[in-house]
Structure formats: structure tokens, C-alpha cells
From Swiss-Prot:
Organism, scientific name: Methanococcus vannielii (strain ATCC 35089 / DSM 1224 / JCM 13029 / OCM 148 / SB)
Protein name as catalogued: Glutamyl-tRNA(Gln) amidotransferase subunit D
Residue ranges constituting the Asparaginase/glutaminase domain according to the UniProt record: 82-413
GO MF annotations in UniProt: asparaginase activity; ATP binding; glutaminyl-tRNA synthase (glutamine-hydrolyzing) activity
Protein family according to the UniProt entry: Belongs to the asparaginase 1 family. GatD subfamily.
Domain of life: Archaea
Protein keywords: ATP-binding, Ligase, Nucleotide-binding, Protein biosynthesis
Classification via CDD domains: GatD
InterPro entries reported for this sequence: AsnA_fam, Asp/glu_Ase-like_sf, Asparaginase/glutaminase-like, Asparaginase/glutaminase_AS1, Asparaginase/glutaminase_AS2, Asparaginase_C, GatD, GatD_N
Oligomeric form and interacting partners: Heterodimer of GatD and GatE.
Catalytic reactions on record: L-glutamyl-tRNA(Gln) + L-glutamine + ATP + H2O = L-glutaminyl-tRNA(Gln) + L-glutamate + ADP + phosphate + H(+)
């Protein structure tokens, strides 16, 4: 019995059929079920094992160093389609099973995505490029810079749209960073998946198809494309600075905050319905792109909670941090016991910015005395900027301006991160 055999395993009260997988535990047999999920079975509880020939089977082979090479893609350009570059950074959308551990790890290059989703070739001329291969929780500011540099290079080489595959956990941080760092006339679309490609419930293919569709549109700016509903119906196009992951596992985890999505994308009919005004591109400047790579990394993001110790702020100040973003309660408040830490930061020229942990809504520190006193201590209320976006924005500002100018610019709407008014519906 070898890895890759299709087997029927009888236990005392049940039976399992599936593909035999490698196991790192000598006492356990691992089987990949038809559902796409793995099950581990203790050998001592197995009554019998029978090798079967699966329906429509081909000889299964796990990826190894000797068989994971593919022949180069031979793609002919269609002059009627736009040229789209897919840049892979890793994550669930670009993952497959690790047959050593049974876990899912990043493994696909961008070209592998084309092989997995051949429908892309009916939408655009695709160029694939892997720039990173990381889980998104390992994303670093220096990787934002690498991504921005890759975007610039692709646009200068003729890309008319960019798709970036990215893990979902920190995708909204990267979307915000690229929004501030990259100035371009082409759409830059980030896309991820909540369920990996080996699972029947995977959202990867529909999300990628929808992302490439969006990348062919005559719009500019940075966006996120993900499932718009739990079912495989539509995907939503979100502004990169007004979107957040709001569920740990649902396929429609990403939502626009304080506004509607920019558009709904139907990957089946290939229709895009815009829900509000877009940022039209200037096609005569399609190859013009500039990036600003300067970021101040000594920025902290702190969630306010009952009993929070002001020593936390003093710690960051003493460690040389340049700015601190607070996720305040409600309209932008902190406990009074936190005031001494804020005062300490202000006296040491450390900028303290206020967002709200409610996510939806706007900071307003003029209503209650707590907010007014915080302002007197130097805290700047930052409208309806999402805390993660505010964190990235001040990194960008302090990387390019002194403290005085950064204070003036923090509440200036630069790339759509501030809504002048909020529809009560959202």
C-alpha cells in the first residue's frame, strides 16, 4: 500500500474511502476524502484496509522535488484583450496541500494560478510573476515596498492592470499601504481566498476571475475583490482604504466600511455593476507610474480597554516610537487613567492619533468632556479613517514629512480614506 492509493478503510462503526496521504505519525493513517478534507485514523482501531481503483482516477502523485516542475506556458497574446500582470505574494488563494504534514501551505506561483483557473485567458492576456511566498501574517513594511516596486516595473513594461494575490489576514493593510505608495492610472486589485483550492468550498477561482475582470476596467486606484455573499454568486469591489476583514472564516468576510462597495462583479455573466462614482483613468498616461517608498516604521497601534495602563504609552515613547494610533472607545475616548501617558507622549513630540474601535462611524471628540480633554492633551481626532489605514497613513506621512507637516496632513483626504459624510445606512 503506497501513498496515492485509493483505499477503503473499515473501522468498528464506520467506513472511509479516499486517497492515502503521507503521515508523520507512525500510529496514524491519513486519508484525503472526496470532500477535500483530511481524516486521521489510528491504526489500532482499523479493522481492514482495501485498495480500490477510484472512479475517473489518474495516477495520483504528491508533489515532490522531482515532479513539481511544469512545462512552460505557451501563451499567445490576444490583441483584443488587455494585458494584466498577476503578482503572487502567497496566502490561501495561492496554496495547496503539503503532503508531508497534511497542512495547507503557500506553494503555487502566479503561473500555477493560470493553470488552475484557465478561464482567466478568456478575460485578459495574463503574465504571472511570484514576488513573495509568505503567509500574510508575516507581511512586513519592506514587503510593501517590494510589491510597489514590482507594480511599477510591470506597468512600465506594458501591464494595463495589476492583480495581487494575497493572504486575507492582512490584505487590508497592504491595500492601504499601496494606496498611499503607488500613483498610477491603472487598476491595482488585491485578491485572496478564505478557503484553499483543495477544498470544495474554495472561493479562490471566483475571486481571481472577478479580480482580473476588475483589472481590465478603465478605473484607477487600489481595490480589494472578494466574495460578496456566502454563496458563489457575486464578488464585490472595495476601495483599498475603506475595506476591512470582518469575519474570520466566512467567504464574504470583507466589507466596505461607511460606504457601499464600488461595484458588484458577476464572474458568470462577466458583468460589472457600479454602485457609485468611480475614479476614471487617463488612458493617455497609462504607463506613467510613481512610487513613494519612504515609511516610518516606528508606529504603534493600541486598542483602548477598561483599565489600560498609561505605562504602555510611556514604553513606546521611551522606545523611540514617532506616533501612536489609538483605537478609542465610542466616539474616541480613553479612561482618564490613560491621560498621563498621553501627556507624556505629547511632551516628547510623539504624535497621538484617535480612531474608533467601533469600525463603523466617525470619531467626534467634541461631544463629551473626555474627548475635549484628550484634544487638549494633544490627541488628534481622525475622522472616519479605519485604524489600520490610519496606522499605514501616518507611516507614510512621517516617512516623507516632518512632525509639523504630518499633523496638518493627517486629516486631509489623500486617496479616499476619509468620507466627507456618512450615509446612515452604513
Amino acid at each position: 500500500m503506497d501513498v496515492g492509493d485509493f483505499v477503503k478503510i473499515k473501522m468498528e462503526n464506520t467506513m472511509y474511502c479516499g486517497t492515502l496521504m503521507p503521515s508523520i505519525n507512525e500510529d496514524t493513517i491519513v486519508v484525503k476524502m472526496k470532500s477535500g478534507y483530511n481524516v486521521g485514523l489510528k491504526k489500532t482501531k482499523i479493522k481492514s484496509i482495501e485498495i480500490l481503483k477510484p472512479e475517473n482516477s489518474s495516477n495520483f502523485q504528491p508533489l515532490t522535488s522531482s515532479n513539481n516542475e511544469f512545462k512552460p506556458l505557451n501563451l499567445e497574446k490576444n490583441p483584443n484583450l488587455k494585458n494584466i500582470s498577476i503578482l503572487s505574494t502567497g496566502g490561501t488563494v495561492a496554496s495547496r496541500v503539503d503532503y508531508k504534514t497534511g497542512a495547507v501551505h503557500p506553494a503555487f506561483t502566479a503561473n500555477d494560478l493560470i493553470r488552475a483557473v484557465p478561464e482567466l485567458l478568456d478575460i485578459a492576456n495574463i503574465k504571472g510573476r511570484a514576488i513573495l511566498n509568505i503567509l500574510s501574517e508575516n507581511m512586513l513594511p519592506k514587503y510593501w515596498v517590494m510589491t510597489a516596486e514590482a507594480i511599477k516595473e510591470e506597468i512600465e513594461n506594458g501591464a494595463e492592470g495589476i492583480v495581487i494575490t494575497h493572504g486575507t489576514d492582512t490584505m487590508h493593510y497592504t491595500a492601504a499601504a499601496l494606496s498611499f505608495m503607488v500613483e498610477s492610472e491603472v487598476p491595482i486589485i488585491l485578491v485572496g481566498a478564505q478557503r484553499s483550492s483543495d477544498r470544495p468550498s474554495s472561493d479562490a477561482a471566483l475571486n481571481i476571475i472577478s479580480a482580473v475582470m476588475a483589472a481590465t476596467e478603465p478605473i484607477k486606484g487600489v481595490y480589494v475583490v472578494m466574495h460578496g455573499e456566502i454563496d458563489d454568486t457575486i464578488c464585490n469591489l472595495h476601495e483599498g482604504v475603506k475595506v476591512r476583514k470582518l469575519h474570520s472564516s466566512r467567504r464574504d468576510a470583507f466589507k466596505s466600511v461607511n460606504n457601499t462597495p464600488v461595484a458588484k462583479i458577476n464572474p458568470f455573466t462577466k458583468e460589472i455593476t457600479y454602485l457609485r462614482e468611480i475614479k476614471p483613468q487617463n488612458s493617455s498616461k497609462i504607463k506613467k507610474v510613481s512610487i513613494n517608498k519612504k515609511l516610518e516604521e516606528k508606529i504603534a497601534l493600541i486598542k483602548v480597554y477598561p483599565g489600560i495602563d498609561s505605562e504602555i504609552l510611556k514604553f513606546y515613547v521611551d522606545k523611540g516610537y514617532k506616533a501612536i494610533v489609538l483605537e478609542g472607545t465610542g466616539l474616541g475616548h480613553t479612561p482618564e487613567t490613560f491621560f498621563s501617558g498621553i501627556d507624556y507622549a505629547n511632551k516628547n513630540n510623539v504624535l497621538v492619533l484617535m480612531s474608533t474601535q467601533t469600525i463603523n462611524g466617525r470619531v467626534n471628540m467634541n461631544i463629551y468632556s473626555n474627548g475635549r480633554e484628550l484634544q487638549s492633551l494633544g490627541v488628534l481626532p481622525c475622522e472616519d479613517i479605519l485604524s489600520e489605514v490610519l496606522f499605514v497613513k501616518i507611516m507614510h506621512l512621517l516617512g516623507n514629512y516632518d512632525l509639523k507637516d504630518a499633523k496638518k496632513l493627517i486629516c486631509k483626504n489623500r486617496v479616499g480614506e476619509i468620507n466627507e459624510s456618512i450615509n446612515l445606512k452604513y
